[in-house]
Amino acid sequence: EQAVNWDFAAEKIKNENRPLKILNLFGYTGCATLACMNAGATVCHVDASKGMVQWAKENAASSGIADRPVRWLVDDCVKFVQREIRRGNRYDGIIMDPPSYGRGPGGEVWKLEEQLYSLVTLCKQVLSDNPLFFILNSYTTGLSPAVMEYLLGVLLQKDFGGKVSSDEIGLKVSDTGLVLPCGSTAIWEK
């Protein structure tokens, strides 16, 4: 269902005539990372699950692009971004697919509806002076595409201009031709 976003990111990267750094937070099995690597970007892939990061590495190897520039990191995404801010590292694009709910190693509770604003605000601080895109995916019931679009618009358009869009994402059912809704996406782009 997220292939539309992978294609969007790859196209934006290919059309830009400069080296690009992309941050993929909550990167799971790495499909977005691979799309960006294949398009020519340097990618930083972050996920808290060691197994998911290993799977993403295997997907890169199976795709024949394991030699492309990428950092594979097993880390808490929020803590990683906080360190990147202190280090002064910047990215030209951010892709994030945060979970709806989770618990940290210390029992901390993560609820996307309560922490999305602060997460995007934090991530905004690692965007370069000339960012290309910010892609936000969600499978959280009750977090509509319109709310996600508004959030990106409020937090990013004032400083970076550009435009914001949102949509439901889903999978087309071959038997019926209907689309099975799977989640929401919002995109800020230059």
Q: Which sequence ranges carry the predicted segments?
A:
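Short glycine-dipeptide loop
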Residues: L122, L127-F134
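Mobile active-site "lid"/loop adjacent to the S-adenosyl-L-methionine
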Residues: K50-M52, V74-V78, Y91-L122
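Conserved class I S-adenosyl-L-methionine
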Residues: N17-Y28
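SAM-dependent Rossmann-like transferase core, predominantly class I methyltransferases
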Residues: E1-N17
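Conserved SAM-binding motif I beta-strand of class I
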Residues: T42-D47
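S-adenosyl-L-methionine
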Residues: S49-I95
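Conserved SAM-binding loop of SAM-dependent methyltransferases across substrates and taxa
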Residues: T29-A41
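C-terminal catalytic and target-recognition region of SAM-dependent MTase-like enzymes
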Residues: P131-K190
